[in-house]
Amino acid sequence: MLKCQNMVLKISGRKFIRFLKPRITFQTNTTRLQPFQNATWRVQVPKREMVTLIVATTYDPASINPATVLLAMPGWTTGPTLPPNIKSFTNQQTRLIQHDVSIVKEDDLDSRWEEATGEVVDEVIFLSRHTAVSNRPALTVHPIGVLHLKEGESPPHGGKAGWAGLTNPRIGPWLRLLKKMAEAHSLVPEFEITLEGTHHGPLTSKPTMFLEIGSTEEYWKRQDAAHVIALLIWEGLGLGGGEPVGNWNSETGKRKVLLGIGGGHYAPRHMDIVLKDDIWVGHLLSGYSLPMEEAKPGESHIGGTWRQSIQSAFEATKASFPGGEILAHLDQKSFKGWQKKAITEFLAEQNINVGRPNDFT
């Protein structure tokens, strides 16, 4: 027995004593210890594991169905409960959490998971339904944020006014993989495979993307669509033993990242570029995310929150792709002359490079 100040330490034939969080190792060459003689103290802070967080909700069949298919695949075990009562499941470095409310209403799930488990969340992937006026069946991928709203305005579908989430680098590579999988499972041409512009919440602090099934209840419940989304995650994260798809590394491969500006919600002209191999995707600002008020006669100032949107989108995209080459791609035909002039001048002022389609090859 060793007395160290007011602390009694027991030794059972071991040559070291460990304390965790942080771990303190006391090493000696004998089991009968003389206080602090011939001993070394070493502080070791345990490594925190990096994990992918997948979020599903029982509130939505287009969310829980793919999650259920995914959980039926090998390797899953029950994980800890996230307060107040959110179930979790674990498979290698992947965590799937399942709650019971709207997918856009549970904020800060990444930081809440870190606080509860001590793990570090590397990215967040939400499973959700998609709605559209056209009611067309679709499988969609998109970043999140509510960049164009003014401070004090209340976003209708989660997030925070003026906020741009970090974009998940997997968006581009997974869109291309999703298209191949959907074709292989005969979902195309019935289902459109597409990007969506940046929109809605919830709040996160880690690189995030949404995978959605649309666009009506009939399609939200489609098991073949749920199966393809589950396979996308399974293969995309390498859970089956293959190489993960879409891990960002500025040291290898192409580094060009598309920042989409303008166009409709489904970003068709940006899509044409993103479907090329090795193109990465940052924020996608549809026309509604770029409110512009034409200057009054005799004035030059163009009002609206479009500058805020572009700047926030650029900064978030840049932070999501360290070492990347961010190129703004404008949907030229979606702007009036005065709008295009104002945007290109602002991009130049902000030192944001503009890329034409051929610049992404």
Briefly describe each language-model feature range.
Residues 274-292:
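Acidic, Ser/Thr-rich peripheral helices and adjacent loops at domain boundaries
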Residues 11-20, 24, 29-205, 216-217, ...:
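N-terminal catalytic or cofactor-binding beta/alpha core of small enzyme domains
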